[in-house]
Amino acid sequence: IADKAGAYPSELSGGQKQRAAIARALASDPEILLCDEATSALDPQTTEAILKLLKKLNAQLGLTIVLITHQMNVVKEICTRTAVMENGRVVEQGDVFEIFANPQEKVTRSFVDTTSSLSGINTLIEEKSPLVQLKPGQKILRFKYLERSACEALVSTISRRFNIDLNIIFGSIEIIGDNPIGGLVVIADGKEDDIRDAVKYLCDINVGVEVILSA
């Protein structure tokens, strides 16, 4: 933005204003950089550029960055630790991976759901989509990988071991803090006892299981 040195603020784009604000803050050689809604109202490309800049500053300058945001995708992209606040108090805090893998508080779960395609199952159920019209004995299950490994072939393992048919509705795997985290929403079709044993097995290997709907 050196070519904008003589420009008025009104002549700058949102991204240029943010870069200027960051440069101004760095002029005093701080140990901590406070960024309050640093990506608010920016387009996706500019948001990505600002986050890359902040990550570069953190790595090259050893700068601690405190980021205030309502955008959980931003938290997922750049942060190593996070604190969730509600009504002016911290209700949950910890490692970003653990917060996304196993949120404890209702407000945290609602924030995390905004970043996951798996939450689309709730819309399908509300709209009574044909995709979620269950036959007798079927269940809709949501799996969530809680370990720092999301590589096990769960669907084939469960199907073979417990003689259950699993139809995948939603699935996702993403990287948070250099660790994979994944989830599936499936329709399980089989004997009640077999499904119950499968759920117990998944819990035993630290895969979170939620029964969303039963027929």
Language-model regions: role of each:
Residues 8-12, 16:
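Conserved ABC ATPase signature
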Residues 27-31:
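A short, proline-enriched helix->beta-strand linker immediately N-terminal to the Walker B motif
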Residues 44-46:
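Helix N-cap at the start of a conserved alpha-helix in ABC-type nucleotide-binding domains
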Residues 75-77:
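A short, surface-exposed alpha-helical micro-motif characterized by mixed small hydrophobic
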Residues 93-94, 102:
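ABC ATPase "signature
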